[in-house]
Design a protein with these regions (language model features):
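Short, solvent-exposed secondary-structure boundary/capping segments
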Residues: 153-154
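Surface-exposed acidic/polar loop and edge beta-strand patches at domain peripheries
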Residues: 1-136, 146-149, 158-272
Length: 272
């Protein structure tokens, strides 16, 4: 595990090789933020099974995923595909056959991970950077299409925050709506709030309807530091939220297509 640290925070980032037992077919193996710890109050992130256990599907901290757009020949019946940031996978068996290799460079304020992947006429390079400045953790991604085929991208972050004492969870800078449901409501304050707490053992998932035209900013209630924030560099597409008794998370998807020779870059600033 790699660690970035200053007087306020320490950030643990999984090592793509040494921490391989923590990876599966879901989350990107480079730039996986496993925990952010406040020097005064302790760990700031959670997970669906945290702190009791860990599994590669649920994860913890701030993982992110490209797994919903596996790359394969559309004419092939083979179950093998390339998952960006993970490697060659067997989709039927839900197994990683060969992990991608990362070049890692760490400085005082950041970690840079770079990999190149090829499969079935797809080719790409992917660079992940995690940087720590004061109380801000920046996670950034650059993807270059170095092959001949367009690369579909359906990526999402999955930051896991601990549940709060009150029912208010997060507030967004974009108008959202959703149907009546058992898990969530829009409070008069503008925050998305819990319903039926503490009966959340099974968890609640809800897609948000929105017509965003600007990049997303999220204010998130936090039991240890009061309020944290996140600023996305992109306009979200599909946008669900999810939580259970241990954690709450929002998942603003980025959906794009990278043409041959094209590169895309985006980032999220997490402010603690």
């Amino acid at each position: 595990m790699y660690t970035l640290q200053n007087e306020a925070l320490s950030v643990d980032v999984l090592d793509p090789v040494a921490d391989r037992e923590r990876f599966g077919t879901r989350y990107c193996t480079g730039g996986y933020i496993f925990q952010v710890t406040d020097a005064s109050v302790g760990p700031l992130l959670s997970g669906p099974t945290y702190p009791d256990s860990f599994n590669t599907f649920d994860g913890q901290g701030i993982p992110d995923a490209f797994n919903q757009s596996p790359l394969k020949d559309p004419k092939s019946t083979d179950a093998r595909a390339l998952i960006i940031g993970i490697g060659r996978c067997d989709l039927e068996k839900n197994e990683v056959e060969e992990f991608c290799s990362w070049e890692v460079r760490q400085t005082e304020t950041g970690i840079r991970m770079h990999t190149e992947q090829e499969f079935a006429h797809f080719a790409l390079s992917l660079t992940r950077e995690v940087e720590l400045y004061g109380r801000t953790v920046r996670s950034s991604i650059t993807l270059n299409n170095t092959g001949r085929r367009p690369i579909p991208i359906r990526w999402f972050p999955h930051p896991f925050y601990p549940q709060t004492e009150g029912d208010e969870l997060c507030r967004l800078n974009i108008p959202v709506s959703f149907p009546e449901n058992d898990g969530y409501a829009l409070a008069d304050s503008g925050f998305i709030a819990r319903k039926n707490w503490p009966h959340w053992d099974k968890g609640y998932y809800q897609a948000l309807a929105h017509e965003a035209h600007s990049n997303l900013v999220v204010l998130q209630k936090h039991p240890a530091v009061g309020l944290v924030a996140a600023t996305c560099s992109y306009v979200p597409n599909f946008f669900p939220i999810w939580g259970n008794k241990n954690t709450f998370s929002w998942e603003p998807f980025l959906e794009r297509s990278a043409a041959a020779g094209q590169h895309l870059s985006w980032s999220i600033d997490y402010e603690f």
